[in-house]
Amino acid sequence: MSISISDSAAQRVSAFLNHRGKGLGLRLGVRTSGCSGMAYVLEFVDEINDDDIVFEDKGVKVIIDGKSMVYLDGTELDFVKEGLNEGFKFNNPNVSNECGCGESFNV
């Protein structure tokens, strides 16, 4: 099982945590949503739960709840800028289908 984070994503998460002034890392999860069934969830973590799986890459802790891990195993979290838009991108090898807008996926 693995989760990785790109250099640009690590820099962005570190900057957000520093600006926020607290936090242990970033929680990455999935929830039921959208036309393809699942959507990614990102949130800052102040506490790690007993069933959480913690990965550390490039100095950033990425926390995954046990239920989401099956959908996220092997995912790389990236931060990209495309024109005037910027945001986190999930390079997930488990995805079999995405909706047209790219907001939800299926495995």
Swiss-Prot record:
The lineage of its organism: Bacteria, Pseudomonadati, Pseudomonadota, Gammaproteobacteria, Enterobacterales. Its cofactor is Fe cation. Binds 2 iron ions per dimer. The dimer may bind additional iron ions. Gene3D superfamilies: HesB-like domain (2.60.300.12). It holds the Pfam family Fe-S_biosyn. The keyword Magnesium does not apply. Belongs to the HesB/IscA family. HAMAP family: Fe_S_insert_IscA. Fe cation binds at residues 35, 99, 101. PANTHER family: IRON-SULFUR CLUSTER ASSEMBLY 1 HOMOLOG, MITOCHONDRIAL, IRON-SULFUR CLUSTER ASSEMBLY PROTEIN. GO terms for biological process: iron-sulfur cluster assembly. One of its GO terms (cellular component) is cytoplasm. The keyword Aminoacyl-tRNA synthetase does not apply. GO terms for molecular function: 2 iron, 2 sulfur cluster binding; iron ion binding. Coiled coil: none annotated. This is Iron-binding protein IscA. Keywords: Iron, Metal-binding. Is able to transfer iron-sulfur clusters to apo-ferredoxin. Multiple cycles of [2Fe2S] cluster formation and transfer are observed, suggesting that IscA acts catalytically. Recruits intracellular free iron so as to provide iron for the assembly of transient iron-sulfur cluster in IscU in the presence of IscS, L-cysteine and the thioredoxin reductase system TrxA/TrxB. Homodimer; may form tetramers and higher multimers. InterPro entries: Fe-S_cluster_asmbl/transfer, FeS_biogenesis, FeS_cluster_insertion, FeS_cluster_insertion_CS, HesB-like_dom_sf, IscA_proteobacteria.
